[in-house]
Amino acid sequence: MGSEFVSFKPWLSNDSAFATHISYTSKEEQLTNVTNCTAIENGWVWNIPLWNNMGTGYCYSSDFVDDETAEKEFKKHLGTDDVDLQKIDIRHGRRKNAWVKNVVGVGLSYAFVEPLESTSLASTHLLISKLIEVLQRRKFNLTKFDIDGFNYSATQEITEARNFVSIHYYLSSRCDTPYWKYQTHEREFMHLDDTYPSSYMGITFSSWYKKILYQHSSEHVWDTNDRGVAYILAGMGHKPISEYYLNWFRQEHPDVDKYLDNVYAQWRQYVESISRYVKTLPTSYEFLKEHIYD
């Protein structure tokens, strides 16, 4: 319908991928319930356990590596040359408007943010739900207000997914190749904007990023409700603790360590109880075999 394509290239460098399927060597152990992502020289490798085999692929940037070298890196990671690879060209981004006239773009017809199955499924489901909600709100009596609202919401959702993915690169500590050095030391995030179409609301990428910087470097408090950023920070080795403020707090409140020890003890007790319970559950392989594929 002629809706302009808005590229996510300033946030996401990867524009190519090799994909394939590989056989299990130990299905009982390798068939897990998560997608594993592993960083290698010029991007990352996904590993999706399926029932009959594992789907895997290498997502990389042609700005830093050519296809032939990327293929060698991927095969080296897999530990075999005996694989049939499919080359995929990637274009991250979204349409300026998901809803144009009487056509609504959902899923890949609207946007794409790296080959992340869960993100694509979640955003597709969410936009379908939002579309149904808009259509039913006034019994199909639609105005430009309804369409603008849907477009704003669609842009918000896919842009937050983009931000969530991009911050993984920026918070990494890896810098052993030109690709990773660019991601962690040379890429400029501070002044990137264009998060939402309504910039007058003050919601931009730079304001979102500055909020993270402020929480991490000034407040030393992480917002666990901010689209999972706190968990990315923790996974990348960051700690929301300032020894300076903690020592000051100890001087003002001598009993603080006693209370902290109590909190830690309760937390450890909770973690141990969860660990004991998990050991009683079937593995992913056992559950799928018994309830789905048997």
Predicted regions located by residue number:
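Glycine-centered secondary-structure boundary/capping sites
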Residues: 2, 107, 111, 275-276, ...
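FAD/FMN-dependent oxidoreductases across multiple families
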Residues: 51, 60-172
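Generic preference for hydrophobic/aromatic residues in regular secondary structure cores
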Residues: 18, 32-33, 85, 103, ...
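Long, low-complexity C-terminal extensions of enzymes
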Residues: 133-294
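Hydrophobic alpha-helical segments and their boundary regions
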Residues: 32, 82, 224-226
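Tryptophan-centered motif/residue detector
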Residues: 1, 5, 41-46, 90, ...
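Generic detector of intrinsically disordered, low-complexity, polar/charged segments
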Residues: 40, 90, 104, 225, ...
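Predominantly flavin-linked oxidoreductase catalytic cores and closely associated redox partners
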Residues: 1-78, 128
